Amino acid sequence: MNSALKAIIELCIEEDLLPKSLDVLEYLLSTTSIPIPACYIRMCITLLVHPEYPTSSNIQESCNWILQQVVENRSKINFDAWSFENDLSDNDMPKENYLKIFSNQCLFTQDVDYWDLIAYMSSRPPDLERWMSLMDIWLRILEIDAEENGSALMKKYMGEDLCELQDAIRICFSCFTLPQQTMESPFATSMSKAPAKTESRGSNSFEGTSRLANLGAKLLCLIWAMLPKGRFFVVHLTDAFHFLSKLDERFSKLNAKQQDLFFGNLGASNLRYCLSQYILMKGIGIGINIRHTRCEFTKQLTQLLPTSLPKNKIRQKLHLRAWVSFLGSALRESDRNFDKELFYTTLKQLYTMYQQTELVGIDRPMAILKDMLVLLDISKKLSLDKIV
């Protein structure tokens, strides 16, 4: 973008005509192929969530439209705009650095990183809805980063030598639990009067909890996609293997409802497939060889055949949920070599083992196993080529 256009945009900002500056950006996105400099993308991100800008104004609507257009037109994505590193190129810098929206008001000049933002959201603040609207867009940026940019942006968030990995896992898991107190706003230190901490209220709705859980699960999947793995198996003593062990540790501390929420939000992801294997193998003490490719599911199922349950009662419940998750993954597969008879036998054996075990709070997983059995039984009788 040439300096004349920057001057027009920043003159509007300086004269308190923010809507006019956004109109210029909207026009450029609609009619030209000119990439939007990172400083103006950061301005839109900031305006969406900054407490000093009301949610009901046209400013938020314009910023949301601009960011959505950037996502839809992938060629216009400037990943540097979403990084918390401030070494931008001259073209990505504003013409006038002194303007508040580029300096002390800007989200990217605050003393926070990406995981601090997720931690703030997981504390269910009163402005959670604003942050969720932004994070829906941000999540799409990270998904495109994984697909087309080699997860370079996520790697920046994880820090050198993955120093942020444990904090990222802890914060993502906080999206599945209810906090007692709202954290300070990411803008607290730069505002003239920092908002006081308050008890969480009004943001613990079912919708808010579901959206946060979905966010936490998707971020974990994006971290998993970033981590190097072996050709077919997750190699021991690697970051990927360490990641699964930390997830298992955190997952075991969730209550039954939270565990169901966690696995449910992982969907049909590769992370769910691999984590299920880790939990199963650890539970019965066999060598942990996690196959992250699904092309030979029958071989992996043979290795995991249920001959015993973990001795620990808590691990028994985790074990059952992991089986439900692992077998559920198989129902989505279209592998020609899929052995339905082995699957049916495994499922029946597992169901029988748990029927004979006295465990409290496993009704839902048992019901899912029963539904699978019925489905498989019908499939066998009708001789269908595919289970589903």
UniProtKB/Swiss-Prot annotation:
GO molecular function, one term: chromatin-protein adaptor activity
Localization per record: Cytoplasm; Nucleus; Chromosome
Keywords: Chromosome, Cytoplasm, DNA damage, DNA recombination, DNA repair, Nucleus
Primary localisation category: cytoplasm
Cellular component per GO, a single term: Smc5-Smc6 complex
One of the GO biological process terms: double-strand break repair via homologous recombination
Alphabetical list of InterPro entries matching this protein: DNA_repair_Nse5/Nse6 (IPR014803)
A family per Pfam: Nse5
Function as written in the Swiss-Prot or TrEMBL entry: Acts in a DNA repair pathway for removal of UV-induced DNA damage that is distinct from classical nucleotide excision repair and in repair of ionizing radiation damage. Functions in homologous recombination repair of DNA double strand breaks and in recovery of stalled replication forks. May prevent formation of excessive Holliday junctions or assist in their resolution.
Complex formation: Component of the smc5/smc6 complex which consists of two subcomplexes, smc5-smc6-nse2 and nse1-nse2-nse4. Interacts with nse6 and rfp1.
Protein name: Non-structural maintenance of chromosome element 5
Organism encoding this protein: Schizosaccharomyces pombe (strain 972 / ATCC 24843) (Fission yeast)
